[in-house]
């Protein structure tokens, strides 16, 4: 345990500049133009805002640009835009397996996976007499749930961010972003669309290692849906954890 504590303390010293006193208290952290790279992840989805598709996973890697618009003693207001070249979205799939035991010989039929809003595993037996042949038909039907991943890209050109306490290294921050994503398959269901609108709102904390470099950790509520540009519009609500590294000039 002692060695682990030493390693953690060493990493902390590497991340936090030792010469904190070199930055005057009156200085404002950050620059007019800021660039960043981020990664985020959500392990599940549920009905939070408008979405009804459950069990979706979502992760992305992207790039961020921010331009400072207003600076006061208490806050900084910025324009924000993000480009996401790599998005992976995972949907639940439904698979039906029918094992017919009568009449012999036994036969098995497996359906193709179908992406649906929710999936619950189930199994049931059936038995009936075919009125045309008088033969007993019996067997079992099993519903199993799977998962498929879909590649997508996204762009959020409409966004804003507010940082509070701009003269402090630790700054509370909040953001709103709006844009769209394009996917290689229809999401989140097979009757959905490959084009979806996306909205994010969240808050977190930003730590400035130097006046021009920072690390930001946020929790975001995200919604995407096709606004009925496709036959169905289930939508997905997710809670994402997002880490961003930024540098300014």
Where are these regions (language model features)?
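Predominantly the C-terminal beta-signal and adjacent terminal strand-loop region
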Residues: 23-31, 204-249
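Short loop/turn motifs that connect adjacent beta-strands in outer-membrane beta-barrel proteins
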Residues: 21-32, 69-79, 165-172, 209-214, ...
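Outer-membrane beta-barrel pore domains and translocons
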Residues: 38-44, 82-86, 177-181, 220-222, ...
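Residues that define the transmembrane beta-barrel architecture of outer-membrane proteins
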Residues: 31-33, 55-61, 149-156, 170, ...
């Amino acid at each position: 345990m002692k060695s682990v504590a030493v390693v953690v303390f060493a990493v902390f010293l590497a991340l936090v500049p030792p010469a904190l006193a070199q930055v005057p208290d009156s200085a404002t952290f950050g620059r007019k133009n800021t660039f960043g790279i981020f990664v985020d992840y959500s392990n599940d989805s549920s009905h939070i805002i408008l979405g009804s598709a459950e069990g979706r996973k979502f992760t992305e890697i992207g790039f961020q640009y921010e331009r400072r618009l207003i600076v006061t003693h208490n806050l900084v207001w910025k324009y924000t835009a993000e480009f996401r070249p790599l998005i992976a979205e995972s949907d639940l799939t439904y698979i039906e397996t029918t094992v017919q035991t009568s009449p012999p010989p036994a036969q098995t039929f497996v359906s193709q996976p179908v992406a649906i809003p929710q999936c619950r595993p189930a199994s049931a037996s059936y038995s009936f007499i075919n009125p045309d042949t008088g033969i007993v038909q019996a067997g079992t039907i099993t519903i199993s749930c799977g998962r498929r991943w879909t590649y997508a890209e996204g762009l959020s050109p409409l966004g804003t961010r507010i940082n509070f306490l701009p003269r402090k290294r630790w700054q509370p921050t909040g953001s709103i972003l709006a844009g769209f994503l394009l996917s290689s398959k229809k999401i989140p269901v097979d009757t959905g669309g490959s084009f979806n609108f996306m909205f994010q709102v969240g808050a977190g904390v930003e730590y400035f290692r130097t006046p021009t470099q920072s690390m930001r950790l946020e929790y975001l509520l995200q919604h995407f849906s096709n606004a009925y540009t496709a036959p169905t519009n289930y939508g997905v609500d997710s809670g994402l954890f997002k880490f961003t590294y930024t540098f300014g000039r």
